[in-house]
Every structure is written in C-alpha cells, then in structure tokens.
C-alpha cells in the first residue's frame, strides 16, 4: 500500500471532475512537465487501484479515469487537454466544473482563470461531430439567466475543427481540437 500524497489526492480529484485525462495532461498540471516522474507515480496509483488506466494501442498514451471508462473518451480528452495546455502556458486555473448547467444551457465545461492578475470566466463547448449552437447562448444572454451564477456573461470557448458560425452578440473564441492554435486564446485575454 502506498501513502497518498496531497498531489495524488489532487490528481484523483481532477480525474473525478473532468472524468478522463492522458499522461501528458496530468504531467503538465501536476508534475511541472516532468514526464518520467509522472509516469512512475501514475503507474503506482494504477497498481494500487486508486485510479484506472486504458490504452488504445501500444504507441498511444495511457488514459486515466477513476470510476468507469467514459463513453465519450475523445470528447472528454479534448477538454482535459485544453485545461492541461492552460497550465503549461502558466495560466492560473481557479475553478473547473464539467459539465455546468446555466439556465437551459448545459455547457461541456466551465473554467475560471486568472491571467495578468485579471480573472476571466469561460463556458467551454467541445464539438467534434456537430456545429456550435449559438442560439442557446444568445437566448441565455437575452434572458439574463446567467445572472443566477455569474455577474457577467461568460465568454465561450468552442473547441472544434468545423467552420462554426459566429454571432456578434456573443464573445466566442474558436480553437482547433488539437489545440495547435491555443495562442488565439492568449491574444484575446
């Protein structure tokens, strides 16, 4: 039996929140991008059954989860990789909620960050098969239902490879699913 460290407990809590994460994401968030240290500790957590691991094939990374393997692994992985990239860029992540219901809208995730000592809030939508439905967010803004949870309407981050339509009434930041254009987010912060 191994003794759980505060970092181990934070890893388990993170996996409970986002459902699934790969080795590189957990490395970026909890191990200061030290891959070998993260692999060894994650293996110990798997061996002692604190977390579970899955690998699609021999050359892919391990994918970690706590309870049972999610049905939409790719969708959940994109969201957790996005959070890992924020940590890698040195952006302070204050709060994460996956998913979050605001009024009639169920966003894939909510994230509160601090960048240049300025707090920002975002609703996250991961669209790997369909297009972003901006109508539900326009309705959320017009009915002011977001006021029950937030002081201002959060910006929307849409992670998708599709050519989604924009709406001038909303503040939407588009990112690709491989997150190769994450600098777009930093430029708009």
Q: Would you name each region that the model predicts?
A:
Residues 1-69:
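Nuclease-adjacent, charged terminal/linker segments that flank catalytic cores
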Residues 18-21, 129, 163-164:
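Short, solvent-exposed loop/turn segments at secondary-structure junctions
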Residues 30, 42, 46, 82, ...:
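Hydrophobic, Leu/Ile/Phe/Ala-enriched alpha-helical segments that form helix-helix packing faces
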Residues 69-83:
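A broadly used, surface-exposed interaction patch
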Residues 70-71, 85-122, 128-132:
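Active-site metal-binding core of divalent-cation-utilizing nuclease and nuclease-like domains
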Residues 123, 155-158:
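Structural beta-sheet core signal
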Residues 132-153:
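Basic, amphipathic alpha-helical patches used to engage nucleic acids or provide basic targeting signals
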Residues 157-189:
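Domain-level recognition of nuclease-like catalytic cores that cleave nucleotide substrates
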């Amino acid at each position: 039996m191994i003794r759980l460290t505060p970092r181990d407990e934070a890893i388990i809590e993170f996996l409970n929140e986002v459902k699934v994460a790969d080795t590189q994401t957990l490395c970026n968030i909890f191990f200061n991008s030290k891959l070998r240290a993260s692999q060894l500790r994650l293996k110990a957590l798997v061996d002692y059954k604190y977390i579970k691991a899955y690998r699609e094939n021999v050359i892919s990374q391990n994918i970690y989860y706590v309870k049972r393997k999610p049905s939409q692994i790719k969708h959940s992985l994109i969201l957790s990789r996005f959070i890992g990239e924020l940590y890698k860029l040195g952006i302070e992540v204050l709060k994460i909620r996956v998913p979050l219901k605001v009024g009639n809208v169920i966003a894939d995730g909510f994230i509160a960050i601090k960048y240049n000592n300025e707090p920002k809030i975002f609703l996250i939508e991961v669209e790997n098969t369909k297009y972003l439905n901006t109508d539900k967010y326009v309705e959320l803004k017009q009915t002011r239902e977001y006021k029950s949870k937030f002081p201002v309407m959060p910006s929307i981050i849409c992670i998708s490879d599709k050519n989604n339509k924009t709406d001038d009434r909303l503040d939407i930041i588009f990112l690709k699913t491989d997150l190769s254009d994450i600098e777009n987010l930093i430029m708009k912060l």
